[in-house]
A protein has these predicted regions:
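Active-site gating/metal-coordination segments in enzymes
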Residues: 90-175, 182-185, 218, 223-240
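Active-site phosphate/pyrophosphate- and oxyanion-stabilizing loops and adjacent acidic/basic residues
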Residues: 72, 99-100, 178-181, 214, ...
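H/E-rich (His + Asp/Glu) clusters that bind or coordinate divalent metals
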Residues: 13, 20-30, 206-276
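An N-terminally biased module of ancient metal coordination in phosphate/nucleic-acid-related enzymes
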Residues: 6-7, 23-93
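Hydrophobic faces of well-ordered beta-strands that scaffold small-molecule active sites
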Residues: 40-44, 83-85, 111-113, 135-137, ...
Length: 276
């Protein structure tokens, strides 16, 4: 299978399943296509015991535990060897749960941290030694829509990570991508956009800002994750629409497309009217 075919097969497999929380999910079923050796799930989260890994007071959702051994069970069924664990917004700038998950997984794990201007350099150095290779800007969950604020946050993140060779990852939307397009295009570090760049399925490829994302991907100046497809949907009938977004991005540049399960699908719930 080509890279394009593998990406679409992975997405199609997700679209065939409803959304369930980690504690409601059945055992994973076996896949029906070949997975490349060394395959990587590029977007996952770990939620530890809240008594040991307390949540950020300003969080917008409260997830149930999702532990490294549960994720490993899924990855064995999917024949996935490597993983990227991303610090979710519910922990603020506390990356302890991510580091815990990376340590449990071992050398096949890498991490993406969340930091701010108060994060000391020695902490970044320590995370680098542990396998962190990027920082995430949670603009969407922080309610940041102002273009100037977004540009300032992006520039500050680039400055912090440049000497380490890390990347900057953004959880945002197409409007913000359009606002920072010039910065992303000239960035000295790799730029990654989460979850289809925050595009909405019902907006289609013509929605404002999506063309800017496509252009960044086509030019090789940014990566985009085909992850968290459920986030783009407001109804299950929109599944073909999110598939069209994926096809548009893959056609632009398959070498700048990343795939992730978004396990354990945080802030998700069964569709209204459907029982778990």
């Amino acid at each position: 299978m080509t890279r394009r075919e593998i990406l679409l097969a992975g997405l199609a497999g997700w679209l065939g399943h409803r959304r369930l929380r980690a504690d409601q999910a059945p055992q994973p079923s076996q896949i029906n296509f070949d997975v490349p050796s060394g395959a990587c799930d590029c977007h996952t989260h770990i939620f530890g015991d809240p008594r040991k890994f307390p949540f950020f007071a300003g969080r917008v959702y409260t997830p149930p535990p999702a532990l490294p051994e549960e994720m490993a069970t899924l990855h064995r069924a999917l024949h996935i060897q490597r993983v990227v664990i991303v610090t979710p917004s519910v922990y603020g700038t506390d990356n302890s749960a991510t580091l815990y998950g990376m340590k449990a997984r071992g050398r096949d794990a890498r991490g993406v941290a969340v930091i701010d201007e108060k994060t000391p350099e020695h902490e970044l150095d320590s995370m680098d030694r542990a396998g962190v290779r990027g920082v995430r800007l949670n603009l969407t969950t922080s309610g940041i829509a102002d273009p100037k604020t977004g540009r300032d946050r992006f520039a500050a993140a680039v400055e912090r990570v440049q000497r380490r060779g890390w990347h900057v990852q953004m959880n945002t939307n197409p409007a913000m991508i359009a606002a920072i397009k010039d910065l992303a295009a000239s960035s000295p570090v790799p730029v990654v956009f989460d979850h289809f760049g925050g595009a909405r399925a019902d907006g289609g490829p013509s929605q404002p800002g999506f063309a800017d994302l496509v252009e960044l991907v086509r030019s090789g100046r940014a990566y985009v994750k085909l992850s968290g497809a459920y986030r783009a949907l407001s109804a299950p009938s929109q599944a073909p629409d999110v598939l069209l977004l994926a096809q548009t991005l893959i056609a632009a540049n398959p070498d700048r497309i990343l795939w992730g399960t978004d396990w354990p699908h945080p802030d998700s719930a069964p569709w209204p009217g459907r029982k778990p």
